[in-house]
Amino acid sequence: MATTIKPLEDRVLVQPLEAEQTTASGLVIPDTAKEKPQEGKVISAGPGRVDDKGTRVPMDVKEGDVVIFSKYGGTEVKYDGQEYLLLNARDILAVVEK
């Protein structure tokens, strides 16, 4: 049986997308100078939060969505050799539509 991470409430598990390795002019950016990625792929999402009336508020994102998130939001999680971010829904700023 495969082990998975299932976010609770209005939390979202995101796999950050790699930052650019080179500049537009072709210069290689060292790891120490790279910005933290702010874009990632939704791996899984919780069922949504429960409002004051006891109604579950559905999530705005779903598995597979590419999202832009707050630069300093979330908790870094390392699982099975992969790095993820566990974000609150409010830390997700936009969904990238292609």
Curated annotation (Swiss-Prot):
Read off the Pfam families from this record: Cpn10
Localization in the cell: Cytoplasm
Region feature Disordered, mapped onto this chain: 35-57
On whether Cytoplasm is a keyword of this UniProt record, the answer is yes
Q: Which HAMAP family match?
A: CH10
Q: Which NCBIfam families match?
A: PRK00364.1-2, PRK00364.1-6, PRK00364.2-2, PRK00364.2-4, PRK00364.2-5
What's this chain's function? Together with the chaperonin GroEL, plays an essential role in assisting protein folding. The GroEL-GroES system forms a nano-cage that allows encapsulation of the non-native substrate proteins and provides a physical environment optimized to promote and accelerate protein folding. GroES binds to the apical surface of the GroEL ring, thereby capping the opening of the GroEL channel.
> How is the quaternary structure described?
Heptamer of 7 subunits arranged in a ring. Interacts with the chaperonin GroEL.
Q: What is this protein called?
A: Co-chaperonin GroES
Name the species this protein comes from. Answer: Cutibacterium acnes (strain DSM 16379 / KPA171202) (Propionibacterium acnes)
